[in-house]
Swiss-Prot record:
It comes from Ostreid herpesvirus 1 (isolate France) (OsHV-1). Keywords: Host membrane, Membrane, Signal, Transmembrane, Transmembrane helix. It is a single-pass type I membrane protein. Residues 1-21 form the signal peptide. The chain crosses the membrane at residues 933-953. This is Uncharacterized protein ORF41. The keyword Repeat does not apply. Its main location: host cell.
Amino acid sequence: MTNMILLSAVFLSLAILETHCANHISTGISTAGEVEIRCVSDNYVKKIMAYNRDRLSDATISIIQNYKQGPYGCDGVAQSSVISGAAKEKRINTPECITTGRIGGLIVRLKSKPKEEDLGKWECYFTDLTDNVDSKTLTDVLTKYNLPNSGYFNADGTPNDFTTELKVLDYDDVTKDVIMGCKLSTDLGTPPTMSDKQPYRSVHLTGDDRYYAEGDLYSRTSFSSTPYDCTGIPQNTNKYLYNCFNVAPNEYRSAAHRPPPFIALTAPSTPSNIILDNVAEKHAFTKHFFFPAEDKAVVDLRGKNVVISPLAVSDYTQIKMKYLSVQNAVFSPPEELINKLGEVLLKELSTATKFEIVNVDNNFAPTIPGDPYKMVMIADQSCVSGVNKNVIYTGLCKKSSSMSVITMTYFSSLDCDKTSHYAYIFYTGNEPREVEILPAGIQEAVGTPPDVTASNIPENSGGNDCESTTAQDVAEKLFGHLQTVCPTIPLCQMPSTVRTVITDGECAQRPFICNNRALVEYHVPLTELTSGSPFANDWSCTAVDKQSPMKTWHKGLRTELACGLGDLKQKYIDNSLPLIVKQGEDSYKVVCSTPPSLCTDNGLTPPRLNKDDKTYTKEELMAPDDYACTDHFDRVEVKKSYELIQDHFGCEYKLYCKITPHNVRCYITNFPQCQTPAYISGTIGSDTIPNTALTPESLSVMFIKGGLVSTTSLDLSIWTIKGIKLAQFTTAADLPDACELAANNIQVTHNMDFTSAGKTVTFTCINKLPLDNTCDISAGHSKDTRYKLEISNDGSNWVALAESTLAIDGSGVKTLTSTFSKEGGIFAEGDGVFSFLFYSLNDDAIRTMYTDRSNIQARCVKMFDSSSSTSTIKAVDYISYDTYRKSLVPKEPTVTTTTESPPPPTTTTRQIHSKEDFDRVKKELGEKLYHVLFFMGVLTVSVAGGVIILSFIGCLIMRKMEDAPQKTKYSV
């Protein structure tokens, strides 16, 4: 009976685990330029879908906006919105002007793919916001509201005619989204080159009647009393505003006044007073706070670049995260704000990590010491008294992990200052590993902050009372709502490293027809999640013509994290990623699936591989200004639309090559499971890690720039350290370039004698000394001796890299147990000497030390009993990538047959030094006990079941035997 109960409990646990896994699997990360967490197979989307169907009949048709344009922009705004079915109209507080020719759109979410004849029945509607109306035709609406055929007017007040047309643009078999577009066709005399290239855009409607615009319905230009001087276009006329400001070729706007393809940020003279311009600022206080998905924002702060990649989006029934990257920004926030931020973050992070916010020399770069965090901020201090009040967290990881993502949006309180309401955006996470600024003219926006009314503040932002709402109140309210809507969202499955590369050259001046997207790479801390890594890039151009109204040719990858330690699931949206295929020994074939004649108007876009594939030689790929991306690897595997490359150590990398006007640029990224090089996980002395691989002469450290191998300059301030096993160097003469990347005559001290603390040996790189990174353990052992490897660049602040315990039992058997900090390392003991290799996992502290290499030191700390002794040893030497590359030239294999004797038995002693060790052992024992009990239960139930079945069969036989004489008796 006990075993039966046990078995029932086991199966119940498995059922719960299965449900848990299903919930994890249902959490997807959409990587087309944003992170969208949706419980795909749970109640979340179903609930929204049912809500929309109940309220809005069979479909949800979003807004078509209709504005009256003044000569300089928004004089009087007449906006309109349409929702199909019998639903009531909602007032949409959308403050932006839609200039002539702007596009509306819709997304219809149905449970199944609709028929084509059904799609044709929907039209674009224009209604007044003040009246509740059923679905009407365009003519009905215009007649009812006496509209002069449109809401558009010329500068002289005369109306313009327009027509509408509806296009079915796309259908997503996964989300069941029917993406449709409504196009406004005007007779405003658009330039001939633009007449058939008005782009289509679509708009999402979420379940709570708030609109989230995906695409671009809004002007990116701040209008002011001084119009832009558009070459060839009369000033003070709105006739060509749309083309002038947004999609016109270069000949329609002068270089001096051409707006950049970004949302512009105002760059005031005082860096501490950074304001978002009209466009971005007004968005912060509508019911849908967002920056358009394809926008980049760049502001010049006295020569310091601030790069805003697609930013934070929060709609209260969907979690959408976008990221802020800042490089060399200068801020000077008040002490009150810094202190408050520290309090809030410490409270909400709920981790053991000490969060320290520093403000040195006006460089606001708060860090968490010892952990790979960076925090940046855009802030305005006009409402300092409200800083403590209304903070909205759009994403927050509450997890005791070494990596997290925090994105906060702060809305200043209206009562503090009714003329200044600015969004505060924070991002915490690994700093971007590379930021390339798009070489477009950065232009200072002109405009004044809007006078925002209380009705425009998001409902969940805490209202407009400076004294009544705390940050905690708002955060708890928001998180409570999110957890109610989608309780299975594991918030910490957000990327913790966001690498944004704003590509150069591609469609730079065509932001609407050709959307220049950023290459975004996501790395998720996978120690507790999966063995794979989400990777995505979003590099697209949108070609618009009569035949194909809207095509985004590169949507990247849509990835989903599986449950537990399962494999990463990847759904490929299309096949337009560039492929690289190895052909022979000396050439690589680069195949780019790029549509023909895309973004080639006016020669703005470099030629792409449209028709004929080109084969590049290694020399071409390795040309100056290129990134080395080929002969570092043993082989190239083409899997679907990307490349998995395996190096000599079994570590997989992702290779992404982009064709630029002059070269092939390749990005290499390693998967998180390769943060520990694969060969380190083998057994010392085996084929995986031969003893010869651990000789001091064979160990070194090479630098890889955030996973991006470079053959050019080395900037240690932003490079990470990774351990790489080099080829077998036997003498110092084999290392001609060992110090190529180090400063000439750099002096490093080492002391390998524990007994003579004052003895030092200096050497220079010119000496080409062997890489003898060793700890001398020949003098003095106790039964339990511990060694700790540390490095320092000033001789006082030491960072522990690894710790090893050498246990020697009474018979002289040595057992080596090594534990590593987050940098990791490996120790091997032989002839009384420890050889070590260490590497850093993107650690700020280590990287900072290597910024100044004038006096880098490494030391071995020997600890036993109650005393310790320290030996300063030679620090890590440097070797150039070029030398490393040469070492990888394949050699003719030598085939030998050897007979090896079995290795002597080794006694392993488990060392328990901490509660963590004890918990780990306890967990292992518990798992073993679980398996034993499980199989005992299965065995018992099996035996019991067999007995029951046999007993039942026996009973049947007995009954048959008893019945037989009776039948015979009555038959006589």
